[in-house]
């Protein structure tokens, strides 16, 4: 279930402020953020965000296809390394 249309999309104020400052100065520096919950606005296109995944900051370059999604969708929090093969135990039986 999505967010109510009358509320509008959510973005943290400090994040929007940083993007606006860089757009005024025509800069494209990496913006470090912990705000995974912020919605990607059209103003964010072309910027790179370092989104925190709980362990490190993952660089996310924003393209036009990402508008409307959340920043956290592009920085996975879990890493699956695969199941361990326990062939030795199964062969003994």
Swiss-Prot record:
Keywords: Ribonucleoprotein, Ribosomal protein, RNA-binding, rRNA-binding. GO terms for molecular function: rRNA binding; structural constituent of ribosome. Signal peptide: none annotated. InterPro entries: Ribosomal_uS19, Ribosomal_uS19_bac-type, Ribosomal_uS19_CS, Ribosomal_uS19_SF. One of its GO terms (cellular component) is cytoplasm. The keyword Ribosomal protein applies. The keyword Ribosomal protein applies. Pfam families: Ribosomal_S19. GO terms for biological process: ribosomal small subunit assembly; translation. HAMAP family: Ribosomal_uS19. NCBIfam families: rpsS_bact. Belongs to the universal ribosomal protein uS19 family. Protein S19 forms a complex with S13 that binds strongly to the 16S ribosomal RNA. This is Small ribosomal subunit protein uS19.
């Amino acid at each position: 279930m999505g967010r109510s249309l009358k509320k509008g999309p959510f973005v943290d104020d400090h994040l929007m402020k940083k993007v606006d400052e860089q757009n005024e100065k025509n800069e494209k520096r990496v913006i470090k953020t912990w705000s995974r919950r912020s919605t990607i606005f059209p103003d964010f296109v072309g910027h790179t965000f370092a989104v925190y995944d709980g362990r490190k900051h993952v660089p996310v370059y924003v393209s036009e296809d990402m508008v409307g999604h959340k920043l956290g969708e592009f920085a996975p929090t879990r890493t699956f390394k695969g199941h361990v093969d326990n062939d030795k135990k199964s062969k003994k039986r």
